[in-house]
Amino acid sequence: MRNFVIEPLHKPSMEECRLRIDNLTKPLYSLARLEGMTERMAGILKEEKPNHLRHAVVIVGADIAVDGPQNQTHGVESLKAMERLASGHSATHGAAKKIGADVFLVDAGLELDTSHIEGVLQHKLAKGSKFFRMHAALTPDMVEQGLDVGFALVDELSEMGYQTIGIGTVGERSLLSALAVTAGITGYPMAELLAENNCTLSIQEKAKQLTASLAEHDLPSQDGVHVLATVGSPDVVVLTGLILGAASHRMAVVFDTAETGAAVLAAKCINEAVMDYVFPSVHMGEPVQKAQMKYLGIKPHLFYGFEMDEALGSTMGLSVLDAGMHMLNDMKTFGEASVNVAVDGPGSERQDGR
């Protein structure tokens, strides 16, 4: 993995941005999290009054546990999904178009070949990850290669002028990797991360088996690279590198599902400073995502009953950042609107009539 530096947020820009927010013609702190997100964007971009963000959406494809008993379709479904995404007519593309975001597709580890699909960037680490209950999911070399792919992708996006990235995944059995990475990093009891499904085993039985498998890989661990190599997947690895690279370029990252959340967990293990540059988006209702949010100390803010990946939630999260820019730039301050500022209460301490 390359050497990189993640700088802290630019406090002077944040302070000036917060003063403007507090002087907008609204009750103090009434826009809640939107205000904090906007203030943080000022610190990320080193701009007191950022505006007109340039968004990219990156969807990384990989199939999970391709040698495991659950693999009945052998990549056919994920191939169809990537072909559909490449057509440009997906829900994600529709949402991205509304906010002027460009969508990039990456094959990091789909089981079937995608080289015939126009527009899919070819960075295949392997034809899917292995089933971690049988052996390590990846190799250390694959992890190093995948992290470098993520860094290289964000290098290009930065050079192209993008300031924010919404991330997503596509692939079969992807929640299995997210589950294992989350348990492997957080150390939370496996039973808390599992949901009831049609499996013949009870949650307790599944938890016992999976916990034993993690222990065989010396997990849980705070070594993010080790976790990725033993129970991770190509998409999570590439997104981990992308998140770290984005932070080193002072670019914001929006994530959504448990799969993308697993990449955030791994990135935080490698460098905690990355969290200043990361924003959650949709609430998915999965125990795995709930555990990730608890461990990261953050909360999703979009509640739509989502059950879809493919970066749709992240794209909607980018639109929330846009809403913050509209608040900051389109609303008037008390001074601009020729309105008297508060003479008492909390507002009197923050509103200066600017």
Model-derived segments and their meaning:
Residues M1-R354:
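N-terminal loops that bind phosphate or other acidic moieties
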